[in-house]
């Protein structure tokens, strides 16, 4: 009788463990769907969705699988209003992606001058370098944006 009870307890515990594991897996899948929605909204400039996420406490500097933040994505896609919304909500403009590039560097590559102006005001460290060893000044020179950077520095 003791063995049957013990075996029943073990089987119940295993069943509960598998159930919790499946539940955890489902939660992770749902969370990843929300992350994708947040980044899609930043990518296309859907500020209503971005604002909803931010107002509900979603981590504004969360990184996607490519190591980008929503601010980086919005800047690269030219979504000025979304960039402004994210900055006003506390997004960190100085974060770097897996290549060491910042949102400002992305805006310079895409020649998004008005976005670059907003991002430049974040005053990231001038010593910040990407993985290629380029600081902002050298990066701007390589991408033909040194005049743009000078104009940002003079404002």
Predicted regions and their residues:
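Conserved ankyrin/ankyrin-like repeat signature
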Residues: 48-49, 81-82, 114-115, 147-148
